Amino acid sequence: QSVENFDLIHPEKVIQMAMKNMPIDYFEYYTTVEPFAEGYYKIGKKEEARKILNQLIKKQQEKITFFNSQSEKQKAFYAREINDDFRRYYMLLLIAEENNDLEFHRQQIVKFNNYNKMMGDYGVDLEQ
């Protein structure tokens, strides 16, 4: 059977298959999942994009909350990792903003700023 005879797979099906094989709750390489949120935005599936972003944001919030529970010595030791987690968190918000999901972005940026304040000196200084 020639390649011409195969139907093209709809982008939504590709994203669904990928998300099925990389479940966020069990798969730690979260940056590889971000493009699927972007993909959902591109095909007009805003709620699906938000669902992925919310799951990824929750993971970042959990990590930041964990670091916040640590001693100052531990926070200092993990300062670079904390900074990286905040930057990953912020990048998730940019996905929504760049895809004109401004309502979601506005809601989430408030939460981001609260987590940033919670970490005090270990938060990040991002121009928003």
Regions found by a protein language model. Name each.
Residues Q1-Q128:
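C-terminal luminal/periplasmic domains and tails of membrane-associated envelope-modifying transferases
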